[in-house]
Amino acid sequence: MAEGLETGSFGKKPRIALTGMGSEHGEENAMEAAKMAAKDGIDVYYIGTLEADGVTTVKVADDEEGHKKMEELLASHEVDGAVTMHFPFPIGVSTVGRVVTPAKGREMFIANTTGTSSSDRIEGMIKNTIYGIIAAKACGKEHPTVGILNVDGARQTEMALKELEKNGYDITFAESARADGGCVMRGNDVLQGTPDIMVCDSLTGNIMVKMLSSYTTGGSFEASGYGYGPGIGEGYEQLVMIVSRASGAPVIAGAIRYAAELVKSKVFEIAKKEFVAADKAGLKDILAARKQMSKPASEAIEVKLRQKRS
């Protein structure tokens, strides 16, 4: 009861593992993050060599053993989720980052930041949108706004998403802060956090998280935000959050809190509902039609290459 009054949490505490070895800032940085998150009513399992009050240490000799131990804890359901610096997600699964934007201090989800939603760039960005909506809804945004970063494939992604909306999928598009508006976002929209979810490819998203978390430190120490986020994909139900080797204690603690929030809101139940709703609105048909449209162009390129060789 006393702990509940102190932390404001009376339910079952989320159990989150953290692999502490391998950081550019040493184990002490990771343990500092574990202690910070533990004060917020989270059971933190620190995988490494250090110990501290309020944190459960799982002793390992090195980073490789730490990863094996993390996977064991996840497989046995001894923990509800994990925060780590690298993880081999399967194709179809990618991570949704969460940052604090500088202009107005608004939080923004970056969909996506690591992993590969699809080998096709535009299909990947369409799927990233669904993954971003899942993460945002799990963090309490009932109708999150979606913006598409003005990168290669943005317009094709917009067309597919608007067709999905027309077919009944619940999606709310953000309006760019620029005078011409629209849901395709520019650089000032990134800085202002115009949409709740910024859709892009994972390489661009990775750079955005890096810049928005470490622009005040020169890049060697990620000081703000929640890291690169959880791996999300259809049928995937293992909560693994990604931080980088440059992530400082505030970001790692943010990632642990992000994980705890997803556990409490039952993110994978939200994901199931969202995928059903998207499929009902014809997501698979839209993706198949898009692939068919891109075939003639790729076949023409192949013919030209053959002609050059002959």
Task: Cite the ranges covered by each PLM segment.
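A cross-family phosphate/adenosyl-ligand binding-site feature
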Residues: 39, 45-74, 150, 168, ...
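Short, glycine-rich nucleotide/cofactor-binding loops
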Residues: 16-28, 115-126, 242-249
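Glycine-rich phosphate/nucleotide-binding loop
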Residues: 101-118, 192-284
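N-terminal phosphate-binding or glycine-rich loops at protein starts, especially the Walker A/P-loop
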Residues: 1-50
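Flexible, glycine/charged-enriched surface loops at secondary-structure junctions
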Residues: 10, 140-146, 170-178, 231, ...
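Active-site rim loops that border cofactor/substrate pockets in soluble metabolic enzymes
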Residues: 60, 64-68, 157-217, 289
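N-terminal glycine-rich phosphate/adenylate-binding segment common to multiple enzyme folds
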Residues: 55-110
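Glycine-rich phosphate/diphosphate-binding loop of Rossmann-like nucleotide-binding domains
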Residues: 26-29, 37-41, 45, 119-181, ...
